[in-house]
């Protein structure tokens, strides 16, 4: 199966620590059938970030308030839909539940 996706894949070694891009509240943590272990952070003002293909060793809990740079978990290989790809973080950004190009926040 071939599928395109929103967001970006950021190459990193398996086991690399994944940190929050900004402060916020952990909205949910779940195992997505395509993207693997995923953490969604609500940053307020309509912004949310999503971190996928994480290992099962998640370091935060749902409803937890976090700061910018909080360790969320580690790069894993749980994204069944991208299992043939090199280890990476699948990162998505949303504004008012609409997908936003994540590269727009990196300068």
Name each model-derived stretch.
Residues 37-40, 64-107:
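Conserved, short, structured surface segments that act as functional micro-motifs
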Residues 1-20:
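Short glycine/threonine/proline-enriched tight-turn/helix- or strand-capping micro-motif at secondary-structure
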Residues 15-16, 30-32, 80:
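Short polar/acidic secondary-structure junctions
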């Amino acid at each position: 199966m071939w599928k395109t996706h929103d967001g970006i894949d950021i190459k990193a070694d398996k086991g690399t620590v994944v940190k929050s891009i900004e402060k916020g509240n952990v909205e949910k943590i779940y195992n997505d059938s395509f993207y693997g272990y995923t953490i969604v952070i609500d940053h307020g003002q309509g912004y949310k970030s999503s971190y996928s293909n994480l290992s099962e060793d998640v370091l935060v809990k749902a409803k937890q308030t976090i700061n910018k740079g909080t360790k969320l978990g580690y790069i894993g290989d749980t994204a069944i839909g991208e299992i043939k790809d090199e280890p990476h973080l699948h990162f998505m950004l949303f504004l008012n539940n609409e997908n936003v190009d994540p590269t727009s926040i990196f300068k």
